[in-house]
């Protein structure tokens, strides 16, 4: 509540800057979130695009490769990745990989002790973040949900995809998997590197750092350079950073907002910002998947989007598989791509990273994806809502009460 009051006051004081992108950039500077101006971005719109691009970048690594993922699924994609990493380690490239213990445990094809030992024997440093020890409840929250790769301190990746072949092949129960990842070259990579090294050094007790990990970077011409803010969520240090950045962006919107998120059970501050945007006439479109890989959450999501539909939001139920993308586009001028779901788990508990990109061209690419995916979606209407069973509506109502824990 205090954030909304402060941000509303802030918006009023800088409204003369006009554009929503300018408002949010000013907000981020006020909050101490660094803006970087010398960047090149490539959106990777499918799993195949991501892994082809990532593997090629790994082949060209010369000094170090850093990977931080929620999980590495023990399948053909992970095997190809670790083969590549082993080759680079043999060449003398430093290779460090980190994955979340819960993310691995919840994976139906986890990396087991024998797999980790084999990986280490090939010259790859691999670490499990926050292993489960007694009392286990102490480890239930604050999981590392980030997906970060940094190569030679010059090239970075982040977005919604872990390491698994279902990003290419899909899954039997939910069909084709849709997701968004991105490649960054330029100054924003320094912040991805800093996030990784902070976590790595904390978990291992090592002291990796120095100029070799933060090399001098080329300057890109203004015609291609893009402005990026890396917004990182660390539970104790920056617990509300991504939630506030989302709410600020929604609050600043002047024309339209498009959101795609797989587990749409947002915090009260984000819901309040959306309602306020609708009240002032901003067009709000939200896309959620019709099917999900997680039980219970979809019913809570349906309950929430139905409430927003009644206030004027357009809700699209994607039926072409599972849309796992975590993106938002505002006024066709700026967007965010990252790891954070719009649920309490991501916004209140886990380690997450989102890139806020102030560039119309990149934003328009995502707008185009949204418009294409509308063709494979059902618009939620009062009639469709009435067709839902009473049981599903009840489960959604209960889920809405439990959103602080989802």
Residue ranges, per PLM feature:
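Charged, low-complexity intrinsically disordered terminal segments
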Residues: 10-406
């Amino acid at each position: 509540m205090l954030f909304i009051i402060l941000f509303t006051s802030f918006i009023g004081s800088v409204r003369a800057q006009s554009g929503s992108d300018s408002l949010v950039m000013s907000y981020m500077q006020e909050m101490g979130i660094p803006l970087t101006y010398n960047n090149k971005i490539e959106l990777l719109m499918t799993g195949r695009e991501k892994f082809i691009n990532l593997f090629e970048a790994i082949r060209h690594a010369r000094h170090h490769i850093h990977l931080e993922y929620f999980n590495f699924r023990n399948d053909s994609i992970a095997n190809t990745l670790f083969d590549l990493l082993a080759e680079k380690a043999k060449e003398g490239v430093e290779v460090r990989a980190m994955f979340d213990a819960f993310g691995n445990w919840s994976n139906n094809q986890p990396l087991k002790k024998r797999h980790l030992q084999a990986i280490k024997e090939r010259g790859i440093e691999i670490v499990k973040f926050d292993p489960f020890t007694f009392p286990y409840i102490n480890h239930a929250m604050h999981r590392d949900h980030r997906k970060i790769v940094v190569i030679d301190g010059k090239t970075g990746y982040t977005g919604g995809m872990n390491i698994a072949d279902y990003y290419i092949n899909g899954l039997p129960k939910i069909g084709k998997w849709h997701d968004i990842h991105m490649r960054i070259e330029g100054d924003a990579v320094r912040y991805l590197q800093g996030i990784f090294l902070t976590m790595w050094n904390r978990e291992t007790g090592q002291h990796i750092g120095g100029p070799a990990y933060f090399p001098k970077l080329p300057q890109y011409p203004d015609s291609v350079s893009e402005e990026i803010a890396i917004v990182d969520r660390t539970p104790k240090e920056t617990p509300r950073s991504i939630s506030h950045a989302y709410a600020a962006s929604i609050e600043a919107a002047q024309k339209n907002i498009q959101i795609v998120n797989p587990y749409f059970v947002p915090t009260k501050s984000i819901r309040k910002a959306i309602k306020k945007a609708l009240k002032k006439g901003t067009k709000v479109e939200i896309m959620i998947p019709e099917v999900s890989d997680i039980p219970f959450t979809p019913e809570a999501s349906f309950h929430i989007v139905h409430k927003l539909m009644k206030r004027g939001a357009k809700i699209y139920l994607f039926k072409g598989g599972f849309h796992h993308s975590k993106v938002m586009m505002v006024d066709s001028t700026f967007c965010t791509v990252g790891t954070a779901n719009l649920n309490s788990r991501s916004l209140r508990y886990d380690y997450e990273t989102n890139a806020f990109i102030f560039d119309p061209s990149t934003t328009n690419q995502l707008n185009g994806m949204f418009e294409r995916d509308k063709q494979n979606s059902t618009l939620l209407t009062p009639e469709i809502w009435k067709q839902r069973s009473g049981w599903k509506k009840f489960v959604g109502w209960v889920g809405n009460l439990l959103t602080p824990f989802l």
